Amino acid sequence: SVGFKAGVKDYKLTYYTPAYQTLDTDILAAFRVTPQPGVPPEEAGAAVAAESSTGTWTTVWTDGLTSLDRYKGRCYHIEPVAGEENQYIVYVAYPLDLFEEGSVTNMFTSIVGNVFGFKALRALRLEDLRIPPAYTKTFQGPPHGIQVERDKLNKYGRPLLGCTIKPKLGLSAKNYGRAVYECLRGGLDFTKDDENVNSQPFMRWRDRFLFCAEAIYKAQAQTGEIKGHYLNATAGTCEEMIKRAVFARELGVPIVMHDYLTGGFTANTTLAHYCRDNGLLLHIHRAMHAVIDRQKNHGIHFRVLAKALRLSGGDHIHSGTVVGKLEGERDITLGFVDLLRDDYIEKDRSRGIYFSQYWVSIPGVLPVASGGIHVWHMPALTEIFGDDSVLQFGGGTLGHPWGNAPGAVANRVALEACVQARNEGLDLAREGNEIIRKARK
């Protein structure tokens, strides 16, 4: 007979390959798969591998025109999740040739673009990705990184302090600038536009940039320290976003900001390249992350979004607090904090790290602890996050009964006291409250 056998085929015949030895150049993914009742895990795992690489539901004649063995994703290992019924961790290896160089957008479109609506699966979560050095080297990464940022700001040996200006919407540009000035004058290193401050009728972006720049220069002159305000350049188009970044550079301010998930990875990488070329630091807010990462069995874990950001580019990224008002488990949070900062991270399942990750000297990103934290959390934050971090107190600064500047003073005094106590060998976890009480005098 002519032709090939058509019809619906089991994915596992082609895409389940338990004998496969992964290559150093493969992108590896760990998926948490919950198959529909009656679907065997091998078939579910193979379906994920197929649909996120070369597969479709049947044999097509054009399969004969290429080498599936060279290009197909492979499900190479499956393990049941302890304590969960009918849930598996499925490991998939993708050949490097499937991905465009230097494009986080293309990487995500391939790996998570189509499989999440798949009928054979009840739920699917991407838990981790191993990005090989061969692919990492095609990305610029963060515009500057931790060390260059410290050198630009001339601030060493302690976490940096920030504050989100509240109320986040409704202030005029002039009053917004006043709030910025008071915080910086009191001793903070940075203040921040909230993620949804773009260019609204009550405060257009250009007015805000001008008044914030004035506040920065005034506070710098008064304190003798370098100050910054994260000017949110996020906009409706890439062109408008770059226009705002250009204006920030012309004002001579040190840092701009972007909402990387709502803005998108293409826009983010564009801005990161501009920032490196023009000496601007880039602060990244993760607005919308919980839509993607909050469900335990469906979506994408934040550690994957954090890795993607380090490739796409950003000097700071919000990464949870462990102690504040938003969700985050300590070991898991510290796992992706290390993924942001360190050059090499060892596989450690207790911290949710499924693969060892080598960043080949792509610069590190400062994790930002923000959300419901205040001065009494300072000892815990100093201990948990260490020096290479940004601690951001919004209400924890502006909520001070005497005003913004005293609120900023309180945070700076508490931070300096905690760092000094730690350097003197005191136990911050045990003696934290006492350290803060002493500093208050």
UniProtKB/Swiss-Prot annotation:
The modification N6-carboxylysine is found at K192. Its EC number is 4.1.1.39. The disulfide bond which can form in the large chain dimeric partners within the hexadecamer appears to be associated with oxidative stress and protein turnover. The modification N6,N6,N6-trimethyllysine is found at K5. Mg(2+) binds at K192, D194, E195. The active site is at K166, H285. The record marks K325 as: Transition state stabilizer. Pfam families: RuBisCO_large (PF00016), RuBisCO_large_N (PF02788). It is an enzyme of class 4 (lyase). GO terms for molecular function: magnesium ion binding; monooxygenase activity; ribulose-bisphosphate carboxylase activity. Substrate binds at N114, T164, K168, R286, H318, S370. One of its GO terms (cellular component) is chloroplast. It is found in: Plastid, Chloroplast. Heterohexadecamer of 8 large chains and 8 small chains; disulfide-linked. The disulfide link is formed within the large subunit homodimers. Belongs to the RuBisCO large chain family. Type I subfamily. This is Ribulose bisphosphate carboxylase large chain. The lineage of its organism: Eukaryota, Viridiplantae, Streptophyta, Embryophyta, Tracheophyta. The gene is rbcL.
